Each structure stands twice: as structure tokens, then as C-alpha cells.
Amino acid sequence: GETLLDVNGGSALTPASSNKVLTAWAALSVLGPDHTLTTKAVVSGGTVTLVGGGDVLLAADAGDPSATVGHAGLGDLARSTAEALKDKGVTSVSVALDDTLFTGPSWNSSWEDGNQAWVAPIQPIMLDVTAHSHSGAYPSDPAMEAAKAFSDQLTAAGVAVTGDVTRGAASSDASELASVESAPLADVLSVSLKTSDNTMTEVEGRLVAIDAHREATFEGATGAVLAQLGTDGFDTTGVTMLDCSGLALGDKVSSRLLAQIIARSAGADGGTVGRTLLTDLPVGALDGTLGDRFEGVGGAGTVRAKTGSLGTTASLTGTVVTKDGRQLAFAVIVDDFEDGGLTSARTAIDNDFVIPLADCGCSG
């Protein structure tokens, strides 16, 4: 689209959670909106292994096929597993966890101390991570928590489980007993973008890395996201991406790149990827992290945007529909203000930039 305003648009600044726009585009581009994540149980000898496939929204018991969070359930998986074991004449097993889909550290060294309240250890299987999001109460080992829940459900389904849950890659000769599928990626991204869930976004980045045959590490994920953006025609020169969620203060992205991704998404050449990305963003005065912004003013219901907030950074990246029906793509980053200035920065973005655009009859 036509550039109407560019003030320091090429400067690489700390994007905060607007960084999630980069990850979301890449994930939709390589995996597709309909992609689902498989959690399965396999057996070798007397050991049933729970294999994580990237679903961090699992229900502990029954899944809800009408929901995104808790779409797949470990109780359902355990009951199907118990039936398969019964068919084999097996009544007693040990249980193991295979969380080897992701490699490397589960904590990013670029994250400041105290951020444990904002992100879980990055592992490929978890019980509904949104139950803990932004609460400061993430489990220290969410994958093992999920495995123990599966083991308990297997016991409840009538299988005798011996010993504690162990950890290790499933045997190469293991055969599948049962599996459950997550909600489609488009729905999963809607949760992570609207609520700005850091854990989910880091997992999504690692899935991009796996698709690109890279290591499913922080470095592999950020490298894969940037590579896909380049493949899709975006100029990532000057970008520093230390994580996929935007939690790292060392992330540096230009507002120009963010706006270009949004403009592409809103245009005819954005395709299904772009339409899905825009649909998944929070809406002003309606939901997600914009639910309490733009209430009763221009922008209510007409702004779709990803928020970003860190101690000294605020950003907003998305679209606004003007009073005369024109859709504009924008990205604003306010960086390096003093501690305590976040509310003022957000207010300036809303009142001095976005709301005037929404109120504008400026199609000419």
C-alpha cells in the first residue's frame, strides 16, 4: 500500500509484544491456518510413552471439541490408550514422557529475572498454559505435570501404572496406541495474540523451526521466523530477534517492518495468511488486551491491533478503519521512556495517533 506517514520508521526499536506479529505471520505462512498438533501415546515393551507435539492447551481430563483451550484432553487420550492396551491383553505398564521435540534451554538467557511471572519454561506439552498466564504461578516443569496427569488418568481408566513417570525419547520400535489433536492453528493463534501469551508464542516459533528443519531452540526459532519473513518478501535488515514473544528487551524491530506485515495482511496479496492474522488480533473495546482501550471513542470496534508493553516500551501494531471507511495499517513504537511512563505512553499512542485516525474523514 501507499505510505502516508513514516517518522523514524526504519529505526530498530524494542517492539515488546508486537514482536508476536512476526512469529504469527511465519507460523501461518509455513504451517497453515488448519494445522493441528498431535499428542500421542506409544508403547514399547511394558512402557507407555506420552509424546508431546506442541500442544500447550491440553485439558487434564476430557477435551472440548467446541473449544480452543482444552480442545484435546489427556483423559480422552488415556481412556483410548487403556482400550488399546486391553485389546493387547496388557493390564500393567510404566509411563514415560517424551518431550524431546524441543531442544536446548527452556529459559531464554535474554529474559530478565522476574519474567517467570510472564512465561513458562518452553516445553512441547503442557496442561492449559493460559490457566497460569500472567499469574506468576507457572509450574517449574509443565511437561512433567502433564505426564503425571496422563498417568493418573490411565490409572483411573483401569490400567495399573508401576513406578514414577520417567523421562526419555520413545523407543524407535514403539507403536502408537492413541492420539488427540489440538484446535487448528488459526484458533490457537487467536488465543495467543489476543491475550499476548508469551509461552504459546515461543512454542509457535519452535514449530516454525521444526518445519524448516532447524533445531527447536530459541535461536532456531528466531532464525526460522526471520528466514520465512525474508522468503515472503519482507526486508528484515537490522532486525535483532532474541525471542519470538517480544519479552526480551534486546529485541529490535522497525515500525516499518511491522506496518508492512500488517499492510500485506490487509491487502489482496495477504491471502489466507494475512486474513487469519488480522482476524486473530485484539479488537478495540471488545476483547483481549484491547478490551479496555478505545471504550466509547473512535477506535472502538474499528481497531484491530497487537499491543506491546514492557517497562520502558509501548507499541501498537494493526489496522484502523477511519470514519469514512478507509482501512489504514499502522505500527507505533514508543521506546526508552522512564520507568513508570507506560500508561502515559499508551495514552499518547491511543489519543494522539490512533483515535485521530479513526475519527478522520480523510479518504481524499
Task: Give short role names for the model-derived ranges.
Residues G1-M144, L154-S190, K194-N198, I210:
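Active-site-adjacent loops and short helices of periplasmic peptidoglycan-processing enzymes
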Residues D6, A209-G364:
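Small-residue-rich helix-loop
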Residues K40, T49, S94-A96, P124-M126, ...:
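Generic structural signal for residues positioned in beta-strands
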Residues A59-D61, S106, V203, L328, ...:
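Generic domain-boundary/flexible-linker signal
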